[in-house]
Each structure stands twice: as structure tokens, then as C-alpha cells.
Design a protein with these regions (language model features):
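Histidine-rich, glycine-flanked metal-binding segment
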Residues: 11-17, 25, 29-71
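Divalent metal-coordination and catalytic microenvironments
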Residues: 23, 38, 43, 67, ...
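Active-site mouth loops of central-metabolism enzymes
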Residues: 75-86, 146-163
Length: 462
């Protein structure tokens, strides 16, 4: 941008310029500001005016924002493009249709996720911004090993330190935005992973390895946790005893698959740990997570869906119409086969998750909003709005939930200085809402327009 343009941003506007007039803006840091006009051009927010001082700008496309609310486009910070190949080509349009303009892919084969990311940057593509972790970095036996449709190939198996070092060397040479550590890693493998990641300045999120506890994982540099996974085992009164038991079970004398072995350990320890929670250890964990800035992406919508069988409700079944026909049929059949019986222990686990989210938030632990779509019958886009509702029900304020779906994922990825805020010079990834989400978080579903890279997305065609 020339100096003249910088001083007078309306002097060199392109034919793609848009002026959103008389709108209330919701910035995740500054909150609500009313009576504004927002000028967009060249994929950026060029100028924010007081409505009374906004120029006429003849020839510029105008959007009447009266009684509307403009906020940054949403993030889904936990998605998997490679989980269902029949869904992959439809995910971008569904994300945009429901106001998700950026996503974090949290695990899949490099050849798939890298191509998805590359395709998203092509000029002719209308796509969310896509940030990728590459494959789940797992131990042996790895969980997502293509053993069934429920366990497609999302991970790489590491049998020893040498394989970790070799695989990490290859991964950090790729165009990755972060890394994801998984549950079957040994402690030495995890430490080797973190050493290479730290040297490469790549943040690592993941599941606390079953061989470890939360405190050791964070001390070694873990910067994110997905699903609160295995936190409860680290804050039980008998946490040390549970860890010794896990190390014994991880010897895998029965030769179980990675998925079966992990499930057996969860079944043996998860509810026992919750029943014997040590409040002092939980406080110590919350304090450490806050001090080290370890982001939590709890994916409450996923676990709530499993626990309550919410996906069997008529309103949820009706939403399947937005999916490709093949996927809609497959999901409908799988939903029916799952039955309608509610498992009390699963309900109890979800209640613990929600209580823990509220507790961690009170202790200033940072959060991101993510869903795990398309796993668990979670429709891309729609499911993120349910996640926001559940975050608020768990104790986050409406603004904190908005932060979790905007600026916090940007901060995790180090892009917060140019996206996910309503500020001049920031990317014009925006959603225009008919209602105020600060009053009712469900208003994020009341989408009037979606703007991606400064262009209005034709969501009515999706």
C-alpha cells in the first residue's frame, strides 16, 4: 500500500470494495461498539468509521448493517478432513455456510491434509483458512491405524526413539502449522518429540500420553490439550498408583490393537479417577495450565452428543439434509444402530467435563472452540455453534466463548496480529449477524452474511 493510500484509504479502492453501514461491531478484545461503518477492500478491513463520519463513497458496494452485528469469522479449532473421504470435498462449503472462516485440522495423513491446505489457497477456491498438524504422532500400537472405519489412518506409529527422531525430522520439514502428540507415546518418545518441536518453533497440542501425567507433559512444553484428555487421571488422589497401573497395561500382554488398548485403559481408570478427584491437585493443574498458557479445546459437543444421543432428536436428523446423500444415509443407519439407551457413566463424564471447563476458565486457563467434526455425527459448521452454547453453559461468558472461537485459535497459531479481530488492517474474514451473541450466544447461528477474504460468500447456494 502506498503512503498516499495509507493516509487516504478511499483514494484507490478497487471494484471489490464493500462498505458495511450503520452496524454494531463485536471485537473479541474490545467488545461491543455501536453505530459504525466498516470499509473493506483488498481482503482487509481498510477503515472503521463512526457512522456519522462515514463518507458516501459512490460506486462502492454497500451493505446495510442496521440492527445487525459484525464480528470476526469463527474458527473450528478441531476438525479432521481425512476422517471421512466422502465428506472431504463438502466440508469447506459447510464451514463457510455456517460462518466458520478458519479451521485447525488436528490430525491426518500428510498427503491428504497438505493437499487440502494447498487447495484452500488457490485464487479460484472459496475456502476457510486451513492450518494443519499433519498426522497424529503416536506410539505403538497406534490408535488410528486404518483398522476400521472408526479408526481410519490418521497417525504415524513410532516404536522407539529413533523412529520418533526420523519422523519428526521429516514432519518439521513440511509446511505444518503445529503438531499433535497422541496417547500411546512413551515418556522418552514424548520428550524427544517436544525437543524437536521446540527447536523448530512448532507448538504441540494433543492428548496427555497414557504413560505420563499432565504435569510432566506441560513441563516438557505441551501448549494445548484436546478433549481434556486424561486430565482426570493426573489429579486423582491415587494418581501415582493409576500411572503405575497404566504403565503395566501399556505392556499390552494380550496384543490388543491401539484403539482397544486405549479404550480398556480409559474404561479402567477414567471414572475411578473422577470419583477420587483431589481438589488440591486440580488447583495445581489449573494453575500450571494458566501460567504456561496451555490452551484447552474440550470438544464438548462431541461428548454431549455421545452422552445424550442428541443426534437422534428430530431437529438433528433434519439437519442431515445438508450432507452429501451417501454420507447422510450412512450416518442415519449408524445412528439407528447406536440405539437410544443412555449410559449413566457417560452422562457423569460429560458433567465432569463441563464442571472442569468452568473451573479452568475461572482460573484463567485459555480455551479454544473445536468440535472434532465429522467424527461423532457432528456436521461441519453447525456443530461449532453447539460447542459455543455448551461452553457458555459450562461457565464461559458469551464474550469468552466468542474469544475461544476467534482470537484464541489465532493466538495459538501466532497469527493474532492480522486476523480474528475487527481492527483496521486485519483480514476481512467476517460474519454479519441478525442478533446480538453477547446477549444470546445462539445468535451466532443467525447469519445474514459471511465475508471471506473481503468477498461476500454466496452461502444461499451451498
Amino acid at each position: 500500500m502506498t503512503m498516499f493510500m495509507a493516509c487516504n484509504p478511499t483514494s484507490q479502492l478497487t471494484e471489490e470494495a464493500i462498505l458495511i453501514q450503520n452496524v454494531s461491531i463485536i471485537d473479541p478484545v474490545n467488545g461491543l461498539e455501536q453505530n459504525k461503518s466498516v470499509l473493506i477492500d483488498r481482503a482487509k478491513i481498510v477503515r472503521i468509521y463512526e457512522q456519522s463520519q462515514a463518507p458516501e463513497l459512490s460506486g462502492v458496494s454497500k451493505i446495510d448493517g442496521t440492527n445487525n452485528y459484525l464480528m470476526p469469522g469463527l474458527w473450528d479449532a478441531h476438525v479432521h478432513y481425512s476422517f471421512d473421504e466422502n465428506m472431504r470435498s463438502e466440508m469447506n462449503s459447510l464451514f463457510l455456510k455456517y460462518g466458520i472462516t478458519s479451521v485447525r485440522d488436528t490430525g491426518g495423513p500428510m498427503d491428504i491434509v497438505l493437499q487440502v491446505k494447498i487447495a484452500s489457497t488457490r485464487a479460484e477456491e472459496i475456502s476457510p483458512s486451513i492450518y494443519i498438524a499433519g498426522p497424529l504422532i503416536d506410539g505403538s500400537p497406534n490408535v488410528y491405524n486404518n483398522s476400521s472405519p472408526y479408526y481410519p489412518l490418521l497417525s504415524i506409529e513410532n516404536t522407539d526413539i529413533q523412529s520418533i527422531e526420523e519422523n519428526m525430522g521429516a514432519l518439521v520439514a513440511e509446511d505444518l502449522d503445529f503438531l499433535k502428540a497422541y496417547e500411546m507415546l512413551t515418556e522418552p518418545q514424548f520428550k524427544a518429540l517436544m525437543k524437536t518441536a521446540n527447536e523448530s518453533e512448532l507448538r504441540v497440542t494433543g492428548h496427555i500420553p497414557l504413560s505420563m501425567n499432565l504435569f510432566s507433559a506441560v513441563d516438557n512444553g505441551l501448549k494445548g490439550m484436546e478433549h481434556l484428555r486424561n486430565l482426570e487421571m493426573s489429579v486423582a488422589q491415587n494418581a501415582d498408583e493409576l500411572q503405575e497401573q497404566r504403565l503395566e497395561m501399556l505392556q499390552n500382554q494380550e496384543g490388543l490393537s491401539g484403539g482397544a488398548l486405549r479404550s480398556s485403559i480409559h474404561a479402567a481408570q477414567r471414572m475411578e479417577a473422577i470419583a477420587q478427584l483431589d481438589s488440591s491437585k486440580l488447583l495445581a493443574a489449573a494453575t500450571l495450565l494458566a501460567e504456561e498458557g496451555v490452551w484447552q479445546t474440550p470438544t464438548l459437543a462431541l461428548y454431549n452428543n455421545f452422552a445424550t444421543k442428541e443426534y437422534l432428536e428430530d431437529s438433528a436428523v433434519e439437519k442431515l439434509r445438508v450432507l452429501p446423500a451417501e454420507v447422510s444415509i450412512a450416518w442415519s443407519e449408524a445412528m439407528k444402530m447406536s440405539g437410544s439407551e443412555i449410559d449413566p457413566s457417560t452422562i457423569a463424564y460429560v458433567e465432569w467435563m463441563r464442571e472442569t471447563v468452568g473451573y479452568l476458565n475461572q482460573n484463567e486457563v485459555p480455551f479454544m472452540a473445536g468440535t472434532d467434526t465429522p467424527i461423532g455425527f457432528l456436521i461441519p459448521g453447525i456443530s461449532l455453534h453447539r460447542e459455543l452454547e455448551l461452553l457458555v453453559q459450562s461457565g464461559l461468558s458469551n464474550l469468552e466463548a466468542i474469544e475461544a472461537a476467534t482470537i484464541e485459535p489465532a493466538r495459538f497459531l501466532g497469527v493474532e496480529r492480522h486476523t480474528s479481530r475487527i481492527l483496521e488492517g486485519y483480514e476481512a474474514d467476517l460474519i454479519l449477524l441478525r442478533e446480538n451473541p453477547l446477549e444470546n450466544i445462539s445468535a451466532t447461528k443467525e447469519i445474514e452474511k459471511v465475508i471471506k477474504s473481503g468477498k461476500v460468500v454466496p452461502i444461499e447456494e451451498f
